[in-house]
């Protein structure tokens, strides 16, 4: 018989093994294991880093700002959110993050919809990506 603690440890190990870390020109993100209908990741934007101005066809995004200091673009609006501010980005809406500050800054991104990293339509990218 397998103890409840052993089952919990196996589940935790499987979860941790599914975490994917990906470096990008602007910083990095950690994507956590997910079901087909969504995902959660922590995006870290390095000082001076800027994500592409982009939108998604198959997902909405919900951001929770973890660190102050980011500049956020959603549609035509550009603003500097406070830590713990929550931002909803409907699919099809151009958006980006920029870090003009001296320290790395993070956002928790929750996406809703059947989508993946391939569902990125870049409108403008400072690193020459399509």
Language model: regions and residue ranges:
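Double-stranded beta-helix
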Residues: 6-24, 96-130
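Short acidic-glycine-tyrosine-enriched beta hairpin
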Residues: 76-94
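Short beta-strand His + acidic residue motifs that chelate non-heme Fe in jelly-roll/DSBH
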Residues: 52-54, 72-73, 89, 95-101, ...
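Glycine- and acidic-residue-biased ligand/ion/polar-headgroup-sensing regions
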Residues: 57-71, 75-76
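A short glycine-rich, His/Asp/Glu-containing loop-to-beta-strand
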Residues: 16-55, 59-60, 110
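Short, Lys/Arg-enriched N-terminal segments with co-localized hydrophobic residues
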Residues: 1-4
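A generic "binding-loop/recognition-motif" signal
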Residues: 47-49, 58-59, 77, 93-94, ...
